Design a protein with these regions (language model features):
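Glycine-rich, basic loop-to-helix element that forms the pyrophosphate-binding segment
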Residues: 150, 166-182
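Acidic donor-binding segment of Leloir-type glycosyltransferases
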Residues: 124-165
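Non-catalytic, C-terminal membrane-associated alpha-helical segments of glycosyltransferases
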Residues: 332-338, 352-431
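Acidic donor-binding loop at a coil-to-helix junction in glycosyltransferase catalytic cores
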Residues: 263-266, 287-299
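Short, flexible, basic/aromatic active-site loop/helix in glycosyltransferases
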Residues: 233-260
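Short aromatic/hydrophobic "clamp" motif used to bind/position activated sugar donors
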Residues: 187
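N-proximal low-complexity "stem/linker" segments adjacent to membrane-targeting elements
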Residues: 1, 6-22, 27-31, 36, ...
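Conserved donor NDP-sugar-binding/catalytic core segment of glycosyltransferases
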Residues: 22, 199-236
Length: 431
């Protein structure tokens, strides 16, 4: 499936059919604001700009009308090949962005990387295209035995980009290391296999008055059946949609409450005082631990339980390179299942008082997890039977406890090494 982006306020492109792709996945933008996606069948041949306009209007006419109504402008009745004629000076979305950029908060972008130098290079290059004046980038290398990540940062020759090493494997450890050296009022996290939109930071800054901002994660490409299937399952954004929203502890909740129904660690930002308030990322959760993930989910939950708000801002979107094979997708879904139940154990450990609420919600949660809307639902296509729903979830609690034991052992070994070094130092300086 070919991935393309269309700006509706410009003349629409013609789409040629060369046999390489049978379908087209289109992201539509209206004065740079992403407003929706749709899938277009190409098997019938080329599409003229007018034909593409008709298809997009059928899929997104309502979203277009909503934006025009918000701007107090009469909505168009169709989308032609010439695009929409709208004066940008009177467009609220652009006016809000301009106001934010008058006094932009300083943002620290933390990229945790592990053995993906080519993807990291693309991510760093895309960050250099940001339409935002006040930011730094901190690359945290979780595999510092190689020089690839360090060399990529050095090659940029840009003082805004810094390299730091975190030799202890684990995404949470890398995140915590990045936070510890960040200078920004806001700390944003990006994965090394993602490419942020050029307005990503500007959109994050729109929500800088809340505790946390999270945005869309869209596909960078859909070249394989596994990538298409993952996106059809909801992708990283779980069909959150293209409408901004603010969530709080007092608002509507998901059947898996207090697990939030949104957000992913590959696209999230926190105010510095929020991170101080809720604490460090749990080092027994996340990639590189037996729990495989969920450190981001726990962080979102702690923000909400602290009485702070989380903004969902779809304009703050990034493009992600999904796993290309069913084997990789299977590992990913298995990790979601393990992480889900590990998350609940971690939450009870951090906030024991939630246990009563969890017990009351258990019947609804079980029904939800058995439905197609579940975040850990198994697709029917081509996945190994040993990764059937439920098996990973049963492993989650034990996986989290293993992570705690591993951390304790690692900390003890570090203490012992430190003690031996101090002893040798004293011996060398005695007498």
């Amino acid at each position: 499936m070919k991935v393309m982006e269309v700006e509706l306020c410009r003349p629409l492109p013609a789409v040629g059919f060369d046999g390489t792709y049978q379908r087209l996945w289109v992201l539509a933008r209206l004065h740079t604001e992403p407003i929706g996606t749709c899938t277009v069948d190409l098997e019938s041949g080329d599409l003229s700009p007018g034909q593409l306009g008709e298809i997009l209007w059928h899929a997104m006419g309502e979203a277009i009308a909503e934006r025009f109504a918000a701007a107090s402008i009469a909505a168009p009745q169709a989308l032609t090949g010439g695009g929409l004629d709208v004066d940008p000076h009177f467009w609220p979305f652009l006016q809000t962005r301009s106001k934010v950029l008058e006094a932009p908060p300083y943002i620290s972008v933390v990229i945790c990387t592990y053995r993906r130098p080519d993807r990291l290079r693309a991510c760093l290059e895309q960050l250099r295209q940001q339409h935002y004046p006040a930011f730094e980038v901190i690359v945290v290398d979780n595999d510092p035995e190689t020089d690839a990540a360090r060399e990529h940062v050095r090659a940029l020759a840009d003082p805004r980009y810094r390299y730091v090493a975190e030799p202890r494997v684990g995404l949470s450890r890398a995140r915590n290391r990045g936070v510890s050296v960040a200078a920004g009022d806001v700390v944003a996290f990006l994965d090394d296999d993602e490419e942020p939109d050029v307005f990503w930071l500007a959109a994050i800054a729109r929500g800088s008055d809340v505790g946390c901002v999270t945005g869309l994660i869209l596909p960078a490409c859909l070249d394989t059946a596994a990538q298409v299937l993952f996106e059809e399952l909801g992708g990283h954004s779980k069909d959150r949609g293209f409408k901004s929203a603010v969530f709080s502890r007092q608002g509507p909740q998901s059947p898996l409450y207090p697990r939030p129904p949104f957000g992913a660690g590959g696209n999230m930002a926190f105010r510095r005082e929020t991170l101080v308030r809720v604490g460090r990322f749990d080092t027994a959760l996340g990639a590189g631990t037996p729990a495989l993930g969920a450190e981001d989910t726990l962080a979102f939950t702690l923000v909400m339980l602290a009485g702070l708000k989380i903004a969902y801002e779809p304009a703050a979107f990034v493009r992600h390179h999904h796993y290309r094979t069913f084997t990789g997708l299977a590992r990913q879904l298995h990790g979601y299942r393990v992480g889900l139940t590990a998350y609940y154990v971690a939450l009870i450990r951090r906030r024991p008082w939630v246990l009563t609420s969890l017990v009351k919600l258990l019947p609804d949660a079980i029904r939800f997890l058995s439905s197609a809307r579940s975040p850990v639902a198994s697709p029917a296509l081509g996945l190994p039977p040993e990764l059937a729903r439920g098996r990973g979830m049963l492993a989650g609690p034990v996986a989290y406890l293993r992570g705690i034991v591993r951390n304790a052992s690692s900390n003890f070994q570090q203490t012992q090494r430190g003690s031996r070094l101090r002893w040798h130092w004293r011996q060398g300086h005695s007498g």
